[in-house]
Amino acid sequence: MIKESTRAAVDALIARYSALEACRADLIKAVEVICASYRQGHKLLVCGNGGSAADAEHIVGELMKGFLLKRKIDDVMYAKMKKVCPAEADYLRDNLQGALPAISLVDEIGLNTAFANDQAPDLSFAQQVLGIGNAGDVLLGISTSGNSTNVIYAVQMAKVRDVKSIVLTGRSGGKLKPLADVAICVPDDETYRIQEYHLPVYHMLCIAVENEFFGPTEE
């Protein structure tokens, strides 16, 4: 279950991009899967290639700090800060923000290049899922074609590790669609137009999840 105000983020997205009505059920399911994972103390892993790699970085940036909300440090955390570092506690409280744990798998340049050189370039994301993916985590794989080999292997390894998978693709969904727990297949076939849908979709995911954990409580 998610808050009605969280679900409203999906409605707001579709109000602006009516073609995404076809994706409504999958958009809601993606929000629910990510929220369920965070509620249990797990994390989000994100991967993609080229422009989708940049999207992976963008998503992590929105989740690990405040996006639309202030995400104030709560009283329990502040009390721990005062105990550990009393002189700096106020500074930390006033400037740090609540975080939603997220890791971009495209970031690990040393690991990715070493693994590509020594083993198999198309398995670099899968290697990271093997290494840091834990049961209850979520993998978000982005591929406009739905056929990116390294993302496919990452999703397969996610299943091995009991990590839920969400994929963000174009209309066909490619080979990723049947592999993923949730497939958001935006309604276009041209790469740049698919990417133009992907950005508002993942912004919505970040807005919705942020609201679920840092937005106003509901009766």
Task: Tell where the protein language model's regions lie, with residue ranges.
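Short, glycine/polar-rich helix-capping loops at beta-to-alpha or helix-loop-helix junctions
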Residues: V167-A180
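Glycine-rich, small/polar surface segments that engage phosphate groups of diverse ligands
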Residues: R39-I132
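Short glycine/serine/threonine-rich phosphate/pyrophosphate-binding segments
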Residues: A53-E57, D122, N147-A154, L176
